[in-house]
Amino acid sequence: MDLITERPRILIVDDEPANLKVMREVLGNQYRLSFAKSGDAALALVEKEPPKLILLDIMMPNMSGFEVCQLLKQNPATEHIPV
């Protein structure tokens, strides 16, 4: 696929399935979407294929959105990604 016409990828991180469904319905036609239900899963996805934007839930079990954001911003490879 031509990189100029390829839709940007957004990573959506939320532990609530209903929220993920809404985001898919709202953004799915304009963007390529990736989903993670935990902070650990989000960090693994970002490492594998960095998105253009991360939409991050704050209140999640095990690792809060604040902790995920802090780890992303401490890493030179991901510090530039808008959260």
Residue ranges and their predicted role:
Residues 7, 50-52, 76-82:
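His-Asp phosphorelay/catalytic-motif detector in bacterial-type signaling
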Residues 14:
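Conserved acidic carboxylate
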Residues 17-35:
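Two-component/phosphorelay signaling modules centered on CheY-like receiver
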Residues 35-53:
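Acidic, metal-coordinating helix/loop segments flanking the phosphotransfer/catalytic sites
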Residues 57:
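Active-site residues of response regulator receiver
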Residues 60:
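Receiver (REC) domain active-site loop signature in two-component systems and cognate sites
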